[in-house]
Amino acid sequence: MAKIRIHEIAKELGYDSKEIIEKANELGLGIKTASNAVEPEIAAAIYEYIQTREIPEAFKKNIKTPTAKKPKKENIKEQEKLNESEKKEPKKEEKLKQEVKKEELKIEKENAKEEEKQEIIDAHKPQSLASATLAKRRGLVIVKKKKDEEEIQVKKEEVKNSNDISINNEERLSLKTMFSNADESLKKKKKEKKSFVASKKESTEKMNFLDEHDFGDISLDDEDEVVLPDFSVKEQEKPQNINKKQPNFIRQAVGNSAGFGLEGGIQRRSRKKPSKKIEKKEVEEVGSVAISKEIRVYEFADKIGKSTSEVISKLFMLGMMTTKNDFLDEDAIEILAAEFGIEINIINEADEFDYVKDYEEETDEKDLVTRAPVITIMGHVDHGKTSLLDYIRKSRVASGEAGGITQHVGAYMVEKNGRKITFIDTPGHEAFTAMRARGASITDIVIIVVAADDGVKPQTKEAINHAKAAGVPIIIAINKMDKEAANPDMVKTQLAEMEIMPVEWGGSYEFVGVSAKTGMGIEDLLEIVLLQADILELKANPKSFAKASIIESSVQKGRGAAATIIVQNGTLTVGSTVVAGEAYGKVRAMSDDQGKALKEIKPGECGVIVGLSEVADAGEILIAVKTDKEAREYANKRHEYNRQKELSKSTKVSIDELGAKIKEGNLKALPVILKADVQGSLEALKASLEKLRNDEIKVNIIHSGVGGITQSDIELASASENSIVLGFNIRPTGEVKERSKDKGVEIKTYNVIYNLLDDVKALLGGMMSPIISEEQLGQAEIRQVINVPKIGQIAGCMVTEGVINRGAKIRLIRDGVVVYEGNVSSLKRFKDDAKEVAKGYECGVGIEGCDDMRVGDYIESYKEVEEQASL
């Protein structure tokens, strides 16, 4: 069998080669280097010696045994003397016991508290004191004892507290007796009480436990014999309190070399064990954990008692790259809870500053009165919505609209038969989807206007879907009935396909034919509106705090932030303290849709208020509160909450999105600063501009706001390369124009949304790479191939289609497959150079870099044409 090298043994055991050499030499093998090889039997002996520290039988002859025979004889003699002294001198033991009792009383007075807490643990028989396992962990050398006489000798060498041998022997005997008594008492108690089985600890934990205690004066004698106490009983039994007081010399031993295994250390450990158990129970008994609907990663980790790194690692394993400050959505929270095995209860933290919820809880339903209905007019662009409202109001709003289309949400009051009706006019252009959705959500009745000569269009369908989603009644107004091309039956048929069935066809929807130009059917329409309002039984309490919806908001010169509102409940008065999202303040002034000053706005009525701290978001709920402090707290909490959410969104990205983010970094971007007159138009423009993108180009809105173009906007644009300033329904002042010229910033203003979007599309198209297309020039058939020295192949061709130009790009086609692409290097007609050869003529063609032309191949000539890309 092959020999085994020393370094192989060291590698397998995890030791250094030098250590293995030392151990081998202890066995008398005479190993010098790690490359020395030994027989497998010798290698097995080395394994056994290192692991058990016992010398194999085969090697005991090679090792010089320590001269321990003489001490053995002495030990035996001393043991015999000890036995004789035990028999002959029982009186000495009694005297010693009396002395022990005196020592007990003395120490009881001095250390009463300590004696109450002290415990004694069952010590094993003397044979177990030489535990090889514990000795190895302490790094001490143990010589295994085989006879009782050797054990007695070891004890005598360990304890040296007295010069008198006989007294010393008696004390050691008494100590042995005490431990044996303790062993018996513990066994009795073990039967009475349920044993406590401690959990098994790793070897490293046991070493740490031993390190916590003072070993006192542990010394090695000439024979390197060390005796350690046995812990096996302590790990299985719960320490019991011993009321019996111990003699002084035993307590000294407890604090000294033998004591670490008896009372002191074990007592401290026994106090720690119950605390750990309690902690575990507390963790297990934790029930449902309340988790906020919007919670950060580190907050979630704190809630469930895990480290942030654990949660982030788990999210990474689930395919989400997050930081500790990122917010978790509900799905992520539920998945994490399942992964960690925790029951959770998701709560909405936004309820803390939900002033609308607080308002609804406090609203008193007494004193309810009928309020004015709120009607929203919706439909496709240019179907006559504003014209219809103009006829009802006897106004000319439509004529003042830029481009003849509505681009704002307007709220108007109309009185019919002594009853007020509030109308909301919404834009029909596709860009104003958000405005139409808001109009449908705050209304009582929706009027869908459809042109009789045009039928149902995309925005008509969208408006119907918004109304259905809001769950409000729908009335269909078929407009332009005065035209010769009017076809109301076509409109009814198209709407019937969308499950909007007219009453006359057995449906539940009212259809009214009207003409905004002649006024036909207007009265009937208003009658149906009031009838529908009566069916709905619209009620409100004018005595409660006001609750209103913000239809539109803007910045008015000299007045500040203004908001168009419709009051839904309560009465809003001048001087009321209000809060709307992040905006708050006192109502300084209010006016109706025609600009007349008002002192109050009742339920169902509309108006414009001034006095908010900033421009409120369109669609926000406005609530009147008691104090300025309350309003400020609501607004500040909402502001901080929204800010933190926005910051988190900017950093959150999943693994699936990471590639898209990297790809997006290569996109060309058009930096834009966008300003508009009202919040609704700004939102519509932002949504439309963000849609103008493809794989190569996009619009980057670096700043947007409501109000005029300011010098700070120009400064921001100048700091951003190639940025432009876009204004909607606003004009720059003289100072701003001069500043823009100095900085080289281009300002473009518009009053029609179509024009703005078209110009931005053209700008984006100019930034895109041009589209390259091919234009076919001609084709020629190779009929002969001529090899010219130092030049290469020349193809004798017949032009079969179009023309072949010198310098043009060509393809060499063989059996319908392109085998080469290149340029025409030379073109000749007989011996003369030619610029081009037309169809039906023969020519010689040289192709740059091609030497594989064959008879029957075709040469196709073409040129590349660049076209401007468009979005």
Swiss-Prot record:
Name the keywords, alphabetized.
Answer: Cytoplasm, GTP-binding, Initiation factor, Nucleotide-binding, Protein biosynthesis
What residue ranges are annotated as transmembrane?
Answer: none
Q: CDD domains recorded for this chain?
A: IF2_eIF5B (cd01887), IF2_mtIF2_II (cd03702), mtIF2_IVc (cd03692)
The UniProt annotation puts the region (Disordered) at 60-101, 184-203
Q: Does the keyword Protein biosynthesis apply?
A: yes
Which molecular function GO terms apply here?
Answer: GTP binding; GTPase activity; translation initiation factor activity
Compartments where located: Cytoplasm
GO cellular component labels: cytosol
Query: Residues of the signal sequence?
Result: none
Keyword Cytoplasm part of the UniProt annotation? yes
Q: Where is this region: G1?
A: 379-386
Per UniProt, GTP binds at 379-386, 425-429, 479-482
Q: Where is this region: G2?
A: 404-408
Q: Where is the composition biased (Basic residues)?
A: 61-72
Pfam families registered for this protein in UniProt: EF-G_D2, GTP_EFTU, GTP_EFTU_D2, IF-2, IF2_N
Report the sequence similarity comment from the record: Belongs to the TRAFAC class translation factor GTPase superfamily. Classic translation factor GTPase family. IF-2 subfamily.
Its function? One of the essential components for the initiation of protein synthesis. Protects formylmethionyl-tRNA from spontaneous hydrolysis and promotes its binding to the 30S ribosomal subunits. Also involved in the hydrolysis of GTP during the formation of the 70S ribosomal complex.
Q: Which NCBIfam families match?
A: IF-2, small_GTP
This protein is called what?
Translation initiation factor IF-2
Can you name the source organism? Campylobacter jejuni subsp. jejuni serotype O:23/36 (strain 81-176)
Provide the gene name from the record: infB
